[in-house]
Amino acid sequence: MKKQIIQKIAGDTDIVGSHAPIKLGNFRHDRNLEHGKEEWLTPPEIITAFGPFDLDPCAPVKRPWETATTHYTIADDGLMVPWEGLVWCNPPYGPKTGDWLAKCATHGNCLALVFARTDTQAFQNHVWPRATSLFFIAGRLSFSHVSGEKGGTAGAPNVLIAYGDLANQRLRDNKSIAGQYLQNVPSNLIRLRQENSNN
């Protein structure tokens, strides 16, 4: 019954078991089936609208367009090496997304692109308490295969998360990507203000 309801809502949906990822058209949340990896490329219009960037620590080995001046690939383990400058982070989506967002927050000069799943632990632990601002993209993005060929529509809406003033300025000054800008008051600052007002 649940499978039928999801199929009816999603249209071209392929579900294999109750815990399997949902496939919508060409897009599959957990990996790019063509290459068997969690490697989907950021649409070039996003890079153009919010760039330029100094570093992309999640860059694919083969890429049809540049996302930053410097690229770290899976061989470099971008999560474990130092970051410099304004960072573009479209991390592998999955259980490690929170680790990438934690590093973005610690670096403090980063723009990250993830699914807008505000109920997740990654969002609760590394976005609301630490982000400077957010930009909820209107509609759903179409990511690309590493060949450069455009994939289907993403299985969830996306959000850009700014950590730091420069990344925030890029979101705030955007004029080409439709969506909703939101200045964030990190929850740790709210608690600090409450504590100070109680003293």
Model-found features: residue ranges?
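Class I S-adenosyl-L-methionine-dependent methyltransferase catalytic core
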Residues: 2-199
